[in-house]
Amino acid sequence: MIRANCRARFTAADFDFIVRTLARSRGDSVSLVDLLGDSETRDSILDHPRLVETILSNAGHLHISSQFYFYVLARYVLRQAGIGDRKLCDYVGSLLETFSRANQLQSPDKIDPPKDGFAGANNRAHEYISDMLIALTRATPEQTFLLRAHVGNYSLFISGIFHENTQRRSLRGAPDIEFYEKVGRSNYQLVASHETARRCELTDVFAGLASRFHDVRLALNELSDRLLHLDEDARPSLVL
């Protein structure tokens, strides 16, 4: 299950990257290390534009975690889109980190890595979205939550990262972007009121994703086109 926890999983290498990127002197390094111990100050530091610039200019040689990488980039494009909720940004970062692994491009009960990677998974997207929606008819309440959350997440990922591929396929009869927006939004709305969402402190995140699905999707389009180029199956490599 995806949670809004990228920031809680940053590594020592991530904090070292922040200090090395932002410190101008040895004294700055000491101050930054102290400041990073405070969560509010840390969040403010994570918004520094130099972090994004350094990540983008050294994408193939980064000694950072994938959760740090995707949080910083997701936060950047979402803020550009006027979405400032850090918890929502954290969730989207976790979503990108999770779905960037090929074996997570399928529903929870079908974890077999697609041999043709991202693009192949997009080609089959509408098939197992339909399968998951059908599975809801026989699911328990807990399974219903997990399935609906996954449908919302998957719809956002496909329409956000693979929007050009999705549009091309829609010309040949496959579901279009509007289909994924509608399905994603409605499933996020439904899970927002679920007890499991309250227990996991995700009610506000799901409600925010439902109400701003279109805006978040456009921000991910920007991320895919300008920063990641995942729509062309050119996944950036990280040295982890």
Describe every region a protein language model picked out:
Residues 1-239:
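Polar/charged low-complexity regulatory segments
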